[in-house]
Amino acid sequence: MSDRIDRDVINALIAGHFSDPFSVLGMHPTEAGVEVRALLPDATEVWVIEPKTGRKVGKLECLDSRGFFSGVIPRRKNIFRYQLAVLWHGQENLIDDPYSFGPLIQEMDAWLLSEGTHLRPYETLGAHADTMDGITGTRFSVWAPNAQRVSVVGQFNYWDGRRHPMRLRRESGIWELFIPGAHNGQLYKFEMIDAHGKLRVKADPYAFEAQMRPATASLICGLPEKVVQSEERKQANNFDAPISIYEVHLGSWRRHTDNNFWLSYRELADQLVPYAKWMGFTHIELLPINEHPFDGSWGYQPTGLYAPTRRFGTRDDFRYFINAAHAAGLSVILDWVPGHFPSDDFGLSEFDGTDLYEHSDPREGYHQDWNTLIYNYGRREVANYLVGNALYWIERFGIDALRVDAVASMIYRDYSRKEGEWIPNEYGGRENLEAIEFLRNTNRILGEQVPGAVTMAEESTDFPGVSRPPSMGGLGFWYKWNLGWMHDTLDYFKLDPVFRKYHHDKLTFGMLYNNTENFVLPLSHDEVVHGKKSILDRMPGDAWQKFANLRAYYGWMFAFPGKKLLFMGNEFAQGREWNHDSSLDWHLLEGGDNWHHGVQRLVRDLNLTYRHHKALHEMDFDSYGFEWLVVDDHERSVFVFVRRDSAGNEIIVASNFTPVPRPHYRFGINQPGKWREILNTDSSHYHGSNAGNAGAVQSDEHESHGRPHSLSLTLPPLSTIWLVREGE
């Protein structure tokens, strides 16, 4: 029995309770020579090999039958490269000792990670295939400052936590280890003795791929190459650009009819992408594709922020989908969830036995609505983890924009909480100052690092300046979902037309605050679930009136200031609520031409016309781009307004939201001349009654609404028409 290593140390090492394996294992100089120590469970014989010659230079003595070996190589005073020849079950294997390598993380990286200012933490943390001293393998690192011991376990070591305990970098709380021979495609996790002595097995927070549920292991996977954003894609997100978003849940857009199974990323690239392009959309927005354990969360409770879900294929398959979208001229928006995470044991919850990623007080760290945990944005390493993730999706996958979910739940400490269920901030207020700073910092970094990529906020309150720069007190988002517009318009259109005159302001109110933010007008997935009915089914009246109301609503929406968003199925008027477990009702478009085809054709024409005419999109956020012509005709529920581009070209939009046709409806205009009907939601092409103005109408020198020139139109029942001026 050697007196060089204390028996208690050997016992602790074998039991997996020793926190500093590099102080014992590997090669160490002694007075008698260099000593090599190794923990190799189930080995029966171990030799030290000199790689240059292949010669055995020393045999290690088994000091403990559980696999602890040690031996001195005399006449050697300096550390040298070596390998171990290990006899396992009668077969000899030549291995490189993980404990023969020095520290992995550079001091500057460790400092930046500790400070929370490492722009790309995923380049350092996690699992990265690498070559060290000519040896190929994988370097692993994980932030777990309060753990007593952390090991890498995986397919390369029989999931045995004794075999690969990691080195702790105490200055940063990061554990690291290079494992020779570990390679891409192998499964792994981190096994740790936590701060309280409890054994935990965790997935890698920075894993680039993960197993599909219910399995939870991470996969060694190379860091994707950076994607260069083209100038065309940068311009596509501009405030003056036409932005029409098709919001999609990949798992239920379309499924295989024989087994109701999902389409793969590559199948979606071949089917969804050309469909969205044909429909005239400019952007596809994906509900979260980060790995998540529960299908019913739709991806909004992610456990693998850096890993595309395996439900639809591999990481490379997902990149194929994005590349296909870009090749088709479509930008890709990713729903991003930095607001909360699920409490699954294998994830971030109590990661090292402490509330590392979350707040310890449930009044700050627990989300009552969703049974999830809230990130501690005030902890530098946590904020860095999230900021790096935003940059990762844009730089490494070519994502063009991030839509941030549930911003209100992040920035208000009392969100969905009663009195006594929340903790005020340091000034006694309800704002989550750390979350606000996190969002501002994220948006600032993205603006600096990836100009052209943008962020969009789903923010349900009247927090000022969500899409204004921090210098103006804002959060720094480029766009904000206009949930007020969505609620007001849906409330209006669900009314029987006879009552709409009493709620005229529902449609006019939006212009009173339109210039306070850069708005997106959303008819999203949230509006077709949980008993709210489909958009079509909310419309009043019989089938004819329901479809007419919906068409008129869409005509109003696509002409109103703000970028556009439709959830899948809305474009062909699906009649039932969305179900994430099944395909959209594509059968509604089978057989003969019907009302659903009419709505689909209308949405396509709306998209194409909206994109073609600058007046409909160039000045969404400038008061010059909009003017009411008729705003107060509540008795007849008629609205008329003008959209205008920077050159002064106008489009007139006239809506009649009753089933009563309005012939000879006169209103004043700014520009006399011949006005051509470029869109009529009541056209027979869309299965309407085909009332209208024979394609065009000439203005009169007839004073109306305080203007010397006017138009006299036929306003079809339950319709919106668009007119463009052709000349004097």
Swiss-Prot record:
* Location of region: Disordered: 686-712
Instruction: Extract the InterPro entries matched here.
Output: A-amylase/branching_C (IPR006048), Branching_enzy (IPR037439), GlgB (IPR006407), GlgB_N (IPR054169), GlgB_N_E_set_prok (IPR044143), Glyco_hydro_13_cat_dom (IPR006047), Glyco_hydro_13_N (IPR004193), Glyco_hydro_b (IPR013780)
Question: Which UniProt keywords are listed?
Answer: Carbohydrate metabolism, Glycogen biosynthesis, Glycogen metabolism, Glycosyltransferase, Transferase
Which Pfam families does the entry mention? Alpha-amylase, Alpha-amylase_C, CBM_48, GlgB_N
Q: What is its EC number?
A: 2.4.1.18
**Which molecular-function annotation in GO is an example for this chain?**
hydrolase activity, hydrolyzing O-glycosyl compounds
Instruction: List the GO cellular component terms.
Output: cytosol
Catalytic activity of the protein? Transfers a segment of a (1->4)-alpha-D-glucan chain to a primary hydroxy group in a similar glucan chain
Which residues does the Swiss-Prot or TrEMBL record annotate as the active site? Answer: D405, E458
**One GO BP annotation of this record:** glycogen biosynthetic process
Report the HAMAP family cross-referenced here.
GlgB (MF_00685)
Q: Which PANTHER family match?
A: 1,4-ALPHA-GLUCAN-BRANCHING ENZYME
Reported function? Catalyzes the formation of the alpha-1,6-glucosidic linkages in glycogen by scission of a 1,4-alpha-linked oligosaccharide from growing alpha-1,4-glucan chains and the subsequent attachment of the oligosaccharide to the alpha-1,6 position.
- UniProt family annotation: Belongs to the glycosyl hydrolase 13 family. GlgB subfamily.
- Name the chain's protein: 1,4-alpha-glucan branching enzyme GlgB
Gene name in the database record: glgB
